[in-house]
């Protein structure tokens, strides 16, 4: 619990000098399975802070899709598991991505690594876990967003076992 409080105090402190980013609040289903295999479903609650700071620009100058930006967050499940995560994300307007004209839809893939404690939930095989997520969101007039995401948590075979877990979530995103 002490680790969680320290982590939250670091990501929730005021962000001096940051132009804009998003606080992301999500709720979903942890360990979603569609292949008929056994599942240990739980409710997944997530908070992320996405910073609008470019860490690395890996693409052509005219395309802002390749700006890697940082995020940090926490996920909690109804079976007492928690995951402290930090990583990078890309973000682009879907209209701009395909037609060159902005619209209200955004595409946000992300990759992170963090500390996982399984609580009474699914045993993922290691304390260090990686998460990849694909998200689509709709930007409202006030710049808030509503999104849906699909993610996968795995230890990338660095543990003795690697069952992984899929998560589908709905999110509300508020600019800060």
What would you call each of these model-derived segments?
Residues 14-16:
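N-terminal signal peptide c-region/cleavage motif recognized by signal peptidases
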Residues 18-57:
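Outer-membrane beta-barrel initiation region
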Residues 23, 53-59, 95-98, 105, ...:
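Repeated loop/turn-to-beta-strand initiation elements of outer-membrane beta-barrel proteins
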Residues 23-33, 65-77, 108-117, 148-154:
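Transmembrane beta-strand segments that form the barrel wall of outer-membrane beta-barrel proteins
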Residues 32-42, 74-85, 99, 121-127, ...:
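Solvent-exposed loop/turn segments connecting transmembrane beta-strands
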Residues 43-47, 163-176:
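Outer-membrane beta-barrel "beta-signal"
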Residues 45-49, 86-88, 134, 170:
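Membrane-embedded beta-strands of outer-membrane beta-barrel proteins
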Residues 49-53, 90-96, 138, 152, ...:
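Residue-level signature of outer-membrane beta-barrel architecture
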């Amino acid at each position: 619990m002490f680790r969680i409080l320290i982590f939250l105090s670091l990501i929730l402190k005021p962000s001096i000098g940051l132009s804009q980013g998003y606080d992301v609040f999500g709720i979903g289903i942890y360990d979603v399975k569609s292949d008929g295999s056994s599942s240990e479903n739980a409710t997944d609650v997530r908070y992320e802070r996405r910073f609008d700071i470019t860490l690395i620009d890996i693409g052509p100058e005219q395309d802002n899709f390749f700006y890697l930006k940082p995020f940090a967050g926490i996920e909690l499940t109804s079976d007492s598991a928690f995951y402290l995560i930090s990583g990078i994300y890309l973000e682009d307007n879907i209209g701009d991505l395909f037609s060159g004209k902005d619209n209200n839809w955004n595409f946000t893939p992300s990759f992170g690594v963090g500390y996982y404690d399984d609580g009474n939930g699914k045993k993922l095989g290691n304390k260090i876990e990686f998460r990849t997520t694909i998200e689509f969101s709709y930007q409202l007039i006030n710049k808030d967003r509503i999104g849906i995401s699909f993610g996968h948590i795995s230890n990338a075979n660095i543990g003795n076992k690697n069952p992984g877990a899929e998560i589908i979530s709905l999110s509300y995103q508020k600019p800060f």
